[in-house]
């Protein structure tokens, strides 16, 4: 079996729960066809660089897949039929990266020190 990374962009007017349900449908489809999903990351509602089918935002998801090629082809066929999906891209990779993607790692910047609030206004008045 081969390793794939798959990104899906769903319409902005569906709820986050519906976007998660779409991910679960994809997981079930891959597992029915003899594959395995190693990681699912929901990136949330993000701005699109340009409008796609009159949408300015989309629900982004990343899936790390270990599956045979026919399973991936069937998943892509199902996504072409689904009206909630704006775009998707599947890339074959040498090995699966199970760590947080850079998109989510950038959000989790809890290691940054807290800035004092009194310094904020002092620079503007000077």
UniProtKB/Swiss-Prot annotation:
Cellular component terms (Gene Ontology): cytosolic small ribosomal subunit
Biased composition (Basic and acidic residues): 105-120
Renumbered residue ranges of the record's region Disordered: 104-126
Protein origin, superkingdom: Bacteria
Entry's Gene Ontology BP terms: translation
Family annotation (Gene3D superfamilies): 3.30.70.60
Cited Pfam families: Ribosomal_S6
Gene Ontology MF terms: small ribosomal subunit rRNA binding; structural constituent of ribosome
Keywords of this entry: Ribonucleoprotein, Ribosomal protein, RNA-binding, rRNA-binding
Matches recorded under NCBIfam families: S6
Family, similarity comment: Belongs to the bacterial ribosomal protein bS6 family.
Protein name: Small ribosomal subunit protein bS6
